[in-house]
Amino acid sequence: MNQIVFTAWVLLFPAACTTLGAAGVFLLRRRSRPCTQRILCGMAAGIMLAASVWSLLLPAIQRGQTLPLPAWIPSAVGLVLGAVGLLQVEQFAGQLLAGGAGHGGRMVLAVTLHNLPEGMVAGLAAALALTGEPDAISGALALSLGIGLQNIPEGAAVSLSLIHISEP
């Protein structure tokens, strides 16, 4: 496969999946029922929680087993630091958007901050795959597929929430 086509696929597939999920808002009525919105938000949260636990937290605990302290401590410290960092970003965003952007502006900022590291990781995986090593190529494809599948319900939940916020 051409390197440019491969890199474009790895980078654009997650974005296309987000767009696909967000396009679901056009299939529903202008103002979705609260039940539909709760189901989609719950599904997106469940997928993100599962991805966090099984793809990040458990592998981090496994890698921590080589350290001289209990394996869960580095992961717990990282989890707490991440939560504190998120609270700091939340406070900063509140001050930044206090001028009237409201909930919609906060949501757009949150989605941007969330997708930035995803794009960076996909780009790094694509760059590593260009070395030609089979593990790097399959890893980049799997990462792109995993991020993309997570982005479908995420895009739906965000678009439905933005529609709900924007209407009186």
Question: What residues fall within each predicted segment?
Answer:
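Helix-boundary and loop/linker segments of multi-pass membrane transporters
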Residues: 1, 97-101, 131-136
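Interfacial loop-to-helix junctions that mark the boundaries of transmembrane helices
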Residues: 2-9, 33-40, 63-76
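Alpha-helical transmembrane segments in multi-pass membrane proteins
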Residues: 9-17, 21, 25, 42, ...
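C-terminal ends of transmembrane helices
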Residues: 21-34, 86-98, 155-162
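Generic transmembrane alpha-helix signature in multi-pass membrane proteins
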Residues: 24, 105-148, 152-162
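Cytoplasmic-side transmembrane-helix entry/capping segments in multi-pass membrane proteins
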Residues: 35-44, 100-105
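Membrane-interface helix termini and inter-helical loops of multi-pass transporters
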Residues: 57-68, 131-132
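Residue-level detector of conserved catalytic or cofactor/ligand-binding positions
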Residues: 163-168
